[in-house]
Amino acid sequence: MLFRSIREIASEKAAIIVRGNRAVTGATDRGDALNVIKRAAASVGAPLTIATHGAVRSRGRDGIEVDLPRLGAVRVGLIGRHQAQNAAVALATLDAMREAGIVDVSDDRIVAGFAAARWPGRLELIDHAFGSDDRRDLLLDGAHNEDGAAALAAAVDDLAPHLRDADGECRMGGESRSNRATLIVAAMSDKAIDRIFGELATSPVLRAARLICTTVGEERSSTPEALADAARRAGLGAAVEIAADPQRALDGAARDRGPVIVAGSLYLVGAVRERLMRQGRLPDDGSLDPEATTGSAESRA
């Protein structure tokens, strides 16, 4: 199993910086990432913009509101406080492109674009019908590394007061069947599962959740039993169960009445999204391709 340091990841990403281009980064001093990127840009004479991180003003079901340079308070239609950093990098990139004459886009259009932003399978909140009289929140997230798991844990805690159960109520907390969340997880065996589950277990909501471990049938997929053992070691989930496949996991989740969270693998999230599209419960925007999204998935924040 291969674990790369932040410095190694930064070095790989900095390789795209070439002479004659501008570079924009949201990297910080964590793991020396910023210094690595600075040196790479300087070595080819590429002007480097370091994005100023925006401060989160509010968080809710429909995204976040963040203070961005020059624009002030802007609504971003993506859930998760980590999206403030991504928004700041996006704005800095657009500004650099405008200065270079590559794009001509007004601030009004930029603000509208942030509000309209959507990311299928990444902290995607769906009002889902589990039955004729059972509509509740279904949260899909492809978190499959430590940073992604940390972002999911923080987002779930932020969302907890707003997540709706099968009775249409927002009453997360405690461990009763009416208000605890159900977390469905699958993961590839070559991932740092203990570390990922350790990050998820930092969330009080996820520690108190009913956990259903499943598999997506890929050759690399970890067994539900191995996931259950890792969850117990991490203290993830107040009750831990096993399901042979995602459909049985969803059927099991329907037996409780709390919100449902699906996470740990883009393959799992993609399978659930495809099922919802076939049922007409999601727009048919194409299935989530784990292989096509691997690059962006590895650098979550």
Tell what function each PLM region has.
Residues 248-277:
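A glycine-rich beta-strand to alpha-helix segment
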Residues 8, 70-210:
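Nucleotide phosphate-binding/pyrophosphate-handling subdomain across enzymes
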Residues 1-73, 87-108:
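Acidic, Mg2+-coordinating active-site environments of NTP-dependent enzymes
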Residues 216-218, 283-301:
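Short, flexible loop segments at boundaries between secondary-structure elements
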Residues 280:
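Surface-exposed, charge/polar-rich loops and edge strands
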